C-alpha cells in the first residue's frame, strides 16, 4: 500500500513536495514551503491522523489532508499529486483513505475542490462524488484603483493584537449559514493571523463609528508572475447587508494589496452569488477560470 499516515519525519519532505508543485519559480518557494508547514500545525487538524502521504520507494508522490468541521458535520479534503498520478489507482487510493477518515469521524459529507483541467472530477465520480458548486477565479490587474470615498462616519483600520475576539465574531456573524462555512474559534483565528501568507496589516475592518460593519482578509499566494495578492474573505455583518458597504470593504483590501507593490489581485467567488459576482465585475475583475466543488454524502447521515 503506497498510502501511509503522516508522521513528523514527513514534515520537511512533504513541505518541499507541496512547495515545488505550487511555486512556478524559486522566488516564492519559501512562501509556499512555510505556509504549508503552517497548515500542518493549525489547531484542530491533527496531521498524524488526518494527513495521508502517497509514497513510492520513499519518494512523496501525493498528499491528502482531511479538515474536519464538526460544527456543520462536514469534511473538506484537499488533494495534491504528481501530474503522472492523475487518475491513477494510487491517487484513487489516496482519496479513498481520506474519505474513510471522514466517515470514521461520523461526518455527514465530504467536499473536494478541483480544477476542471485536472481531470480529477471523473475520478471522484467513480467513488460516489457529484459536482455541487462552481466557483469563479477572478483577477484584477488594472493600472489604477477605483476612485471611492468612504461614506461619512465610516472608517477602516487594520487588525491589531487585541482584535482576535472581534475578528472571530465579525467573521462568524458574516458567514454563518453560508454554503460551506464552519464557524471558527478564537484559537483558529489567532493562528491564521500568524500564517506566513498573511499580514495583520492586510486584515481590515470597516467601522461605522465604533460599530464593526464588516471585514476583509487578504493573503498572498503563488502565481505565474510571482506573488499575487488575494481577497481571501469579504464579510458584512447582518445588520449592514444591503447598504452597499461591501464595495468599500473590497476597495480597502485592494488598496492595501496595491500598497505592497502587488500588481495582480485575485479572488474566488461562488458562481451562485450573483450580487458578489456583479460587484467584482463592476470593479474590474475578470473571470479567469473555474473551480468545481464535489460532494459525497457519507453513510449514516
List each language-model region with its residue ranges.
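Acyl-donor-binding surface of acyltransferase catalytic domains
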Residues: 68-71, 83-152, 294-296
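Conserved acetyl-CoA-binding loop-helix of GNAT-fold acetyltransferases
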Residues: 87-100, 233-236, 242-259, 277-282
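C-terminal "cap" of GNAT-fold acetyltransferases
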Residues: 136-155, 263, 268-274, 289-301
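A short beta-loop-alpha structural element at the N-terminal edge
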Residues: 1-16, 155-169
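Flexible, substrate/cofactor-facing loop regions flanked by secondary structure
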Residues: 24, 32-36, 150-227
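Conserved donor-binding loop and adjoining core beta-sheet/short helix segment
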Residues: 19-100, 208, 216-227
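Conserved active-site alpha-helix within GNAT-family acetyltransferase domains
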Residues: 115-133, 243, 247, 271-289
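Conserved hydrophobic beta-strand within the GNAT/NAT acetyltransferase core sheet
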Residues: 110-114, 231, 265-269
Amino acid at each position: 500500500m503506497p498510502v501511509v499516515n503522516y508522521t513528523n519525519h514527513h514534515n520537511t519532505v512533504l513541505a518541499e513536495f507541496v512547495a515545488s508543485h505550487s511555486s512556478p519559480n524559486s522566488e516564492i518557494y519559501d512562501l509556499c514551503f512555510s505556509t504549508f508547514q503552517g497548515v500542518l500545525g493549525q489547531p484542530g487538524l491533527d496531521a498524524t491522523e488526518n494527513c495521508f502521504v502517497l509514497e513510492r520507494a520513499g519518494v512523496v508522490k501525493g498528499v491528502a489532508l482531511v479538515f474536519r468541521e464538526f460544527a456543520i458535520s462536514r469534511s473538506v479534503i484537499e488533494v495534491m499529486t504528481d501530474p503522472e498520478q492523475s487518475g491513477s489507482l494510487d491517487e484513487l487510493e489516496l482519496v479513498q483513505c481520506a474519505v474513510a477518515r471522514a466517515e470514521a469521524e461520523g461526518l455527514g459529507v465530504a467536499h473536494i475542490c478541483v480544477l476542471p483541467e485536472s481531470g480529477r472530477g471523473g475520478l471522484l465520480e467513480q467513488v460516489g462524488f457529484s459536482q455541487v458548486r462552481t466557483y469563479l477565479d477572478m483577477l484584477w490587474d488594472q493600472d489604477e484603483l477605483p476612485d471611492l470615498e468612504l461614506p461619512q462616519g465610516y472608517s477602516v483600520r487594520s487588525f491589531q493584537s487585541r482584535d482576535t475576539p472581534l475578528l472571530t465574531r465579525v467573521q462568524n456573524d458574516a458567514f454563518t449559514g453560508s454554503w460551506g462555512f464552519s464557524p471558527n474559534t478564537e484559537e483558529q483565528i489567532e493562528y491564521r493571523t500568524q500564517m506566513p501568507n498573511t499580514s495583520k496589516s492586510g486584515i481590515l475592518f470597516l467601522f461605522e463609528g465604533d460599530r464593526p460593519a464588516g471585514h476583509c482578509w487578504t493573503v498572498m499566494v503563488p502565481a505565474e508572475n510571482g506573488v499575487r495578492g488575494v481577497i481571501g474573505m469579504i464579510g458584512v455583518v447582518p445588520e449592514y447587508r444591503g447598504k452597499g458597504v461591501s464595495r468599500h470593504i473590497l476597495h480597502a483590501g485592494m488598496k492595501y494589496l496595491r500598497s505592497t507593490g502587488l500588481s495582480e489581485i485575485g479572488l474566488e467567488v461562488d458562481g451562485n452569488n450573483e450580487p458578489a459576482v456583479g460587484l467584482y465585475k463592476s470593479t474590474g475583475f475578470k473571470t479567469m477560470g473555474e473551480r468545481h466543488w464535489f460532494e459525497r454524502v457519507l453513510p449514516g447521515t
